[in-house]
Amino acid sequence: MRVTDFSFELPESLIAHYPMPERSSCRLLSLDGPTGALTHGTFTDLLDKLNPGDLLVFNNTRVIPARLFGRKASGGKIEVLVERMLDEKRILAHIRASKAPKPGAELLLGDDESINATMTARHGALFEVEFNDDRSVLDILNSIGHIPLPPYIDRPDEDADRELYQTVYSEKPGAVAAPTAGLHFDEPLLEKLRAKGVEMAFVTLHVGAGTFQPVRVDTIEDHIMHSEYAEVPQDVVEAVLAAKARGNRVIAVGTTSVRSLESAAQAAKNDLIEPFFDDTQIFIYPGFQYKVVDALVTNFHLPESTLIMLVSAFAGYQHTMNAYKAAVEEKYRFFSYGDAMFITYNPQAINERVGE
């Protein structure tokens, strides 16, 4: 399969730079996987699309202020983007500088360059950095870090982004990007879903900066997926198995929830799904056999991204590309702060030929 098969024209004006005033007031494009039928509505219509006993699976990761500015002690300006917190003192990070720092280099971080750190080792494209400070990494980031808005939101981060770029149920700090499908859920909508009898469970996948890396190969099968840490605890496994047993659907909120659940299913030895606490490099593209997820809530993704490939594997390539074409024509808002889709699984997607 060619990466260009997943390209589409997107006017710049449809990229959302700010969220809607109310989280659940965005538009919702519903795609019926088996037929390809499209329905236009608003996000709160989700209430009518879910049945009592259906299971919503959310990702409860919390975005950390992962972008740091400063300079090398030798003088050159640097920008640090945290990929992962290794422990209380160390991070793994991308560093942008005119000349990459060498192991042992001293870094002065923060807008006032008040935080001292040392680049201790290099691991491929990533740098290991140790803070010379009494505070924990998380405390330091909360003090001097900026919210790492995606590159396509072409503006500096603002104080409001510290809450707007978080889900209302975010709990475990560690992500460099928000699981954006979850941004549309507010407390009133969650309360109505609970009142209807919709079940809820929470996985954790700490979204890494790799999620914004373009696919740099021509053929999809040659792409090496970035690694991210995911947790699917026992209570989620039990909720999934119970939903399946009673004939209800498992509905993933966001592609990160999909990747967590399907990673746990891939690793399972004795059951459909088993607890999972590990890094995952799962790459879902057409031909992938879904085992757990029956429906998906997701935002609109970038052309030629691994995420539009994941959606194509779920709903079918042609149905997905037709839906995106309709979304552009109807002027839906795209990407992290944009509108959403509700998609049901197309069991025939696995047999579809792409790009022929």
Curated annotation (Swiss-Prot):
It comes from Escherichia coli O1:K1 / APEC. One of its GO terms (molecular function) is S-adenosylmethionine:tRNA ribosyltransferase-isomerase activity. Monomer. Pathway: tRNA modification; tRNA-queuosine biosynthesis. It is an enzyme of class 2 (transferase). Transfers and isomerizes the ribose moiety from AdoMet to the 7-aminomethyl group of 7-deazaguanine (preQ1-tRNA) to give epoxyqueuosine (oQ-tRNA). This is S-adenosylmethionine:tRNA ribosyltransferase-isomerase. The lineage of its organism: Bacteria, Pseudomonadati, Pseudomonadota, Gammaproteobacteria, Enterobacterales. Its EC number is 2.4.99.17. The gene is queA. Belongs to the QueA family. It catalyses: 7-aminomethyl-7-carbaguanosine(34) in tRNA + S-adenosyl-L-methionine = epoxyqueuosine(34) in tRNA + adenine + L-methionine + 2 H(+).
